[in-house]
Amino acid sequence: MDIGEILNLLPHRYPFLLVDRVVEIIPGQKLTAYKNVTINEPFFNGHFPGHPVMPGVLILEALAQATAILAYKSENMDPSRKLTYLMGVDGARFRKPVLPGDRLQLEIEVVRHKGAVWKTKGLATVDGARVAEGEFLATVVDKDADAAESAAS
């Protein structure tokens, strides 16, 4: 799956789109994707000057975006009518820094799926070395219902 299809699925845009390519997807089971990390990423200006390191929370966000792609493709959802929200992250661990020039591999595996709720395990690696991991809880909602709820509050 190339960047064009990813842009059709996810609402995220620069500088917050953190998935560049999906290389494997088994609907309802697992997904493998990549994020190419370059020195041009805006977060490197302040994290950390002179020693650029990708913020761990953005690695988790990349895994969450990959989870959303897996949910959309598993259920053949229309992304113009649906949104996926991250509900929680458990057991997040950061093992090694991610640096400019790294290719971040994102691996998502479905732990459980019931209705609109997805629980996944996410693993981020660089050159086969584990850099971050966690369990993700996400929900898929109707865009119209979400807009109506926001207007009512």
Curated annotation (Swiss-Prot):
<dbReference type="GO" id="GO:0019171">
    <property type="term" value="F:(3R)-hydroxyacyl-[acyl-carrier-protein] dehydratase activity"/>
</dbReference>
<keyword id="KW-0456">Lyase</keyword>
<comment type="similarity">
    <text>Belongs to the thioester dehydratase family. FabZ subfamily.</text>
</comment>
<dbReference type="GO" id="GO:0009245">
    <property type="term" value="P:lipid A biosynthetic process"/>
</dbReference>
<keyword id="KW-0963">Cytoplasm</keyword>
<dbReference type="InterPro" id="IPR029069">
    <property type="entry name" value="HotDog_dom_sf"/>
</dbReference>
<comment type="function">
    <text>Involved in unsaturated fatty acids biosynthesis. Catalyzes the dehydration of short chain beta-hydroxyacyl-ACPs and long chain saturated and unsaturated beta-hydroxyacyl-ACPs.</text>
</comment>
<keyword id="KW-0444">Lipid biosynthesis</keyword>
<dbReference type="GO" id="GO:0005737">
    <property type="term" value="C:cytoplasm"/>
</dbReference>
<keyword id="KW-0443">Lipid metabolism</keyword>
<feature type="active site">
    <location>
        <position position="47"/>
    </location>
</feature>
<dbReference type="GO" id="GO:0016020">
    <property type="term" value="C:membrane"/>
</dbReference>
<dbReference type="InterPro" id="IPR010084">
    <property type="entry name" value="FabZ"/>
</dbReference>
<keyword id="KW-0441">Lipid A biosynthesis</keyword>
<dbReference type="InterPro" id="IPR013114">
    <property type="entry name" value="FabA_FabZ"/>
</dbReference>
<dbReference type="Pfam" id="PF07977">
    <property type="entry name" value="FabA"/>
</dbReference>
<protein>
    <recommendedName>
        <fullName>3-hydroxyacyl-[acyl-carrier-protein] dehydratase FabZ</fullName>
        <ecNumber>4.2.1.59</ecNumber>
    </recommendedName>
</protein>
<dbReference type="GO" id="GO:0006633">
    <property type="term" value="P:fatty acid biosynthetic process"/>
</dbReference>
